[in-house]
C-alpha cells in the first residue's frame, strides 16, 4: 500500500509540474487578450508570460491536491481520474477564453444563467462553432497525452522538484513585481490584471511604505505624472467628448455622507440638510450603484457599473466628468475625511487632480470631518475668476462617532461599538441611535458649509455612496456590503440648481444619472450620453430604470423593483425578493440579462 501511495504521489507531482507548463501554452489567448497600443516593455513581457504560467498553475493546484486523497487507488484508476480532472480544467479554460474574447468578461453566474435560461435567444451557437470547439478540445487532449507521457518519464526523477521550484519562484516573482509597481502608482503591469480568470494580484503598499522600500512622496507624484499614459483594453469613452461651456459657469459642489441610509434623511436627524432640501429637487427613489464606497463612488462619477472598477483602477483612467471639468478650467477642491487611497479614488476618480491631499491629519473621523469643512470654506472664499468643483466626503457616520457632549441627541445609544456582539438578538436601536447621533453631527458641519456657499452661482448635490443596515431584515445583516436591499442601496439625493424651482420627484433614479445631468447642465455636449455612461438625465421621467446594475467589492446584482439577481464569484447566483427571500416563482427576463451584459462589456475594446 505504501509503495502504491508513494508511486502515485510521485507521478502526481510530476504531472502537476508538466501540466502547469502545458496550461500556460494551451491558454495562450489570455496573454494576447490586451489590445496594446504600444510595444511591450521587457518587464511587461516577462510579467505576462510568467503570470500565465504561475497563475494558471495555481488555479489547477487545488484540484491536484484533492487528487492526493485518491492515491490509494490502483495506478491506472488514479491516473485516469487525474487526467479526467485535467481535461475538465482544459475545457473550462477553453470556454472562458471564448467568453472573454467575446465579452471581455470571464465566466460568471450571469453568463451561465443566460446560457441555460436564455438559450438561443442569447447565444447563437451554430453547428460549425460546435464542431470547431470540439476539434480544438480534441487537439488539447492530444497535447495532454504528450504531457502525461513526459510526466511518466519524470515521475522517478528529481527534475520534477526542480520544475515545481521554478513554477513557485516564477509565481512569487510576478506577485512581488505587481506589489512593487502598485506601490509606485505605476500601471505598467497592473493593466493586465483582467486577462486571467480569478486573478487577484498581490498589493502591499502599507508594508512597502512602512519599510521604506519605496518613498511614498515620490510614489504619489507618479500618480499625477502617469496621467497621459494610455495602456488598457478599455474603450472609454466610446467617442471623443466635445463640449462648449455655456455663457455662465456655476460652481459645482458634491457633498457626500458615507453610509447614509434614506430613512434617516429627516428633520429630526438632519435638520440643516432638511431645511436646505426645501430649496432643492428631492429624488425620493434614488439608488446608489453599489452597497460599498468603492462601487457607490465609482458609479456616481463614472456613470458606469462597478463591474468596470478593476479595469479603470488598473489603467488609472479618470472619468469623463472630471476630465471635462478640468479641461474647462474648473478649480478642484477635493476634501475627503477618510484617506482617498482606500478605496483608491486617488488613482481613479481624482487621478488627474494635482496637489491632492491623500489623507487628513486628524486622528478621528470627528476631527477629520471638521477639518475638511474648514478647508472647503477657506477654499471657496479664494478670489478667482474661474468656477470650482468641490467634493466633501464625510466619514463620521461610517464609524458612528460624534462629539458626545454636544451631539448625543438620540438616547439610549451604544456607548462603545463592539461588532463581535452583533447578532439577531441584539437591540438594534442602541446601535442605530449612535449612528443617528453621528449624522446629527455631520449635519451641523454641512450647515456651516451651506451658510458659506454662494447659492446664486453654485449647483449643490447632496447624497451618499451607499446606505446602512441595522438588521432590518432580521437576517443578521449589519452595516453595508452584505446585500442589495433598499436599506443598503437606497440613498438620499438633493440637487440644488439656481433658478430651478424646488420639487419632489418620486420615480426611480440612480447614481448613473447624476453625471449625464451635470454634463448637460454645465456644457453644450456634442455626442450622446451613451458614449460615456449607462445613465440618463435625472429629469427624464420616461427613461427606463426598472432594472439597474449594483456592485460591491466581490459580487454584483441586477436590481429590479421587486426582484434582484445576485451574481457571486465562482458561478453561484440567487434570485431574491426585496425582503431577501429566495424567489422561485418570478424570473429575471432574458432581455434584461442581455441588456445588462451589454452594459458591462460595452466599454471594452472588441476583438
Stretches with model-predicted labels:
Residues 1-199:
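Transmembrane and membrane-interface helices of multi-pass
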Residues 6, 10-16, 71, 75, ...:
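Membrane-interface soluble catalytic domains
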Residues 56, 94, 98, 307, ...:
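Phosphate/oxyanion-binding loops and surfaces in catalytic or ligand/nucleic-acid-binding neighborhoods
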Residues 170-419, 535:
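Active-site-proximal alpha/beta segments of enzymes that process anionic O-linked groups
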Residues 198, 220-221, 374-381, 415-458:
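A long, amphipathic alpha-helix that forms part
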Residues 258, 300, 325, 392, ...:
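Generic structural signal for small/hydrophobic residues in well-ordered secondary structure
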Residues 312-317, 429-441, 483-489, 500-518, ...:
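A short beta-strand-to-alpha-helix junction
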Residues 454-499, 545:
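Histidine-centered active-site microenvironments of extracellular/periplasmic hydrolases
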Amino acid at each position: 500500500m505504501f509503495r502504491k501511495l508513494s508511486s502515485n504521489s510521485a507521478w502526481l507531482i510530476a504531472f502537476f509540474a508538466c501540466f502547469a507548463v502545458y496550461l500556460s501554452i494551451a491558454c495562450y489567448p489570455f496573454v494576447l487578450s490586451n489590445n496594446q497600443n504600444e510595444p511591450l516593455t521587457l518587464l511587461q513581457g516577462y510579467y505576462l508570460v510568467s503570470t500565465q504560467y504561475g497563475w494558471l498553475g495555481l488555479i489547477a493546484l487545488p484540484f491536484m491536491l484533492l487528487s492526493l486523497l485518491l492515491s490509494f487507488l490502483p495506478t491506472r484508476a488514479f491516473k485516469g481520474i487525474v487526467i479526467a480532472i485535467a481535461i475538465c480544467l482544459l475545457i473550462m479554460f477553453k470556454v472562458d477564453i471564448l467568453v472573454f474574447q467575446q465579452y471581455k468578461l470571464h465566466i460568471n453566474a450571469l453568463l451561465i444563467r443566460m446560457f441555460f435560461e436564455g438559450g438561443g435567444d442569447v447565444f447563437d451557437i451554430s453547428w460549425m462553432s460546435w464542431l470547431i470547439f470540439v476539434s480544438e478540445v480534441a487537439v488539447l487532449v492530444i497535447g495532454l497525452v504528450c504531457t502525461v507521457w513526459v510526466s511518466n518519464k519524470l515521475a522517478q526523477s528529481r527534475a520534477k522538484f526542480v520544475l515545481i521550484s521554478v513554477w513557485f519562484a516564477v509565481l512569487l516573482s510576478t506577485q512581488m513585481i505587481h506589489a512593487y509597481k502598485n506601490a509606485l502608482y505605476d500601471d505598467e503591469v497592473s493593466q493586465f490584471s483582467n486577462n486571467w480568470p480569478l486573478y487577484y494580484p498581490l498589493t502591499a503598499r502599507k508594508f512597502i511604505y512602512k519599510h521604506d522600500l519605496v518613498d511614498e512622496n515620490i510614489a504619489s507624484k507618479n500618480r499625477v505624472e502617469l496621467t497621459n499614459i494610455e495602456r488598457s483594453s478599455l474603450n472609454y469613452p466610446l467617442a471623443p467628448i466635445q463640449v462648449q461651456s455655456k455663457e455662465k459657469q456655476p460652481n459645482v459642489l458634491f457633498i457626500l455622507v458615507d453610509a447614509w441610509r434614506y430613512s434617516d434623511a429627516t428633520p429630526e436627524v438632519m435638520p440643516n440638510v432638511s431645511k436646505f432640501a426645501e430649496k432643492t429637487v428631492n429624488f425620493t427613489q434614488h439608488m446608489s450603484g453599489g452597497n460599498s464606497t468603492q462601487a457607490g463612488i465609482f458609479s456616481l462619477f463614472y456613470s458606469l457599473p462597478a463591474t468596470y472598477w478593476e479595469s479603470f483602477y488598473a489603467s488609472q483612467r479618470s472619468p469623463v466628468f472630471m476630465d471635462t471639468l478640468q479641461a474647462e478650467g474648473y478649480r478642484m477642491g477635493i476634501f475627503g475625511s477618510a484617506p482617498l487611497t482606500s478605496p483608491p479614488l486617488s488613482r481613479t476618480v481624482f487621478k488627474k487632480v494635482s496637489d491632492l491631499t491623500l489623507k487628513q491629519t486628524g486622528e478621528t473621523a470627528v476631527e477629520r470631518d471638521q477639518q475638511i469643512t474648514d478647508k472647503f470654506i477657506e477654499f471657496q472664499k479664494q478670489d478667482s475668476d474661474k468656477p470650482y468643483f468641490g467634493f466633501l466626503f464625510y466619514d463620521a457616520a461610517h464609524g458612528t462617532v460624534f462629539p458626545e457632549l454636544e451631539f448625543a441627541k438620540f438616547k439610549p445609544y451604544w456607548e462603545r461599538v463592539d461588532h463581535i456582539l452583533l447578532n439577531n438578538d441584539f437591540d438594534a436601536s442602541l446601535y442605530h441611535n449612535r449612528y443617528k447621533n453621528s449624522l446629527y453631527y455631520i449635519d451641523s458641519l454641512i450647515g456651516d458649509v451651506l451658510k458659506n456657499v454662494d447659492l446664486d452661482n453654485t449647483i449643490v448635490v447632496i447624497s451618499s455612496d451607499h446606505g446602512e443596515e441595522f438588521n432590518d431584515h432580521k437576517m443578521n445583516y449589519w452595516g453595508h456590503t452584505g446585500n442589495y436591499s433598499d436599506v443598503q442601496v437606497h440613498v438620499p439625493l438633493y440637487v440644488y440648481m439656481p433658478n430651478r424651482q424646488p420639487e419632489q420627484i418620486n420615480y426611480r433614479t440612480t447614481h448613473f444619472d447624476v453625471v449625464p445631468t451635470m454634463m448637460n447642465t454645465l456644457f453644450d455636449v456634442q455626442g450622446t450620453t451613451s458614449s460615456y455612461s449607462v445613465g440618463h438625465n435625472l429629469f427624464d421621467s420616461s427613461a427606463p430604470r426598472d432594472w439597474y446594475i449594483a456592485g460591491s467589492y466581490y459580487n454584483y446584482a441586477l436590481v429590479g423593483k421587486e426582484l434582484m439577481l445576485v451574481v457571486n464569484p465562482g458561478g453561484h447566483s440567487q434570485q431574491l425578493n426585496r425582503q431577501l427571500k429566495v424567489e422561485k416563482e418570478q424570473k429575471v427576463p432574458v432581455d434584461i440579462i442581455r441588456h445588462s451584459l451589454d452594459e458591462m462589456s460595452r466599454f471594452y475594446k472588441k476583438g
